[in-house]
Regions:
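Catalytic and binding regions of secreted/periplasmic enzymes and modules that target cell-wall glycans
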Residues: 24-25, 38, 43-50, 61, ...
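Export/targeting segments at the very N-terminus of extracytoplasmic proteins
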Residues: 2-4, 12-58
Length: 128
């Protein structure tokens, strides 16, 4: 009996606990203060957060491998085609995976926004 209890206890540790999606899904609004800190205008924050939710659902290490330009990275899903621009801007040093750091990702998004507005994100995420 003790052996059976030991086996069951071990098995219970190996089975992941079930959680609701809401309990494990991050919230882009957690990055509001950081976005303001790196230079985003507070008037742009609602749209920024809406795009963040659409692009990554708040997962800082989101990576879209299917993107044809070596993927899209991080909160704002920055496209690999922007690597040269981001290197010239001093945001990315070597690898686009550096954009998994939320601060760096929001800086990159701001640099792209200042250059192109919301176009890199299709420009269709205005809050109603």
């Amino acid at each position: 009996m003790k052996r059976l209890l030991g086996v069951l206890a071990t098995a219970a540790l190996l089975v992941p606990a079930t959680q609701t999606q809401a309990a494990v899904e991050p919230d882009c609004r957690l990055y509001t203060a950081l976005a303001l800190e790196v230079g985003w205008d507070k008037r742009e924050i609602p749209r920024l957060m809406q795009i963040c939710k659409r692009e990554s659902k708040g997962f800082a290490r989101a990576w879209n491998q299917r993107d044809p330009y070596t993927g899209s990275y991080g909160l704002m899903q920055i496209n690999g085609s922007n690597k040269g621009f981001l290197q010239d801007a001093g945001i990315v040093r070597k690898a686009m995976t550096e954009l998994w750091a939320p601060r760096k990702n929001l800086k990159a998004a701001l640099a792209l926004f200042k250059r192109h507005g919301w176009l890199p994100w299709k420009g269709n995420s205005a809050p109603k």
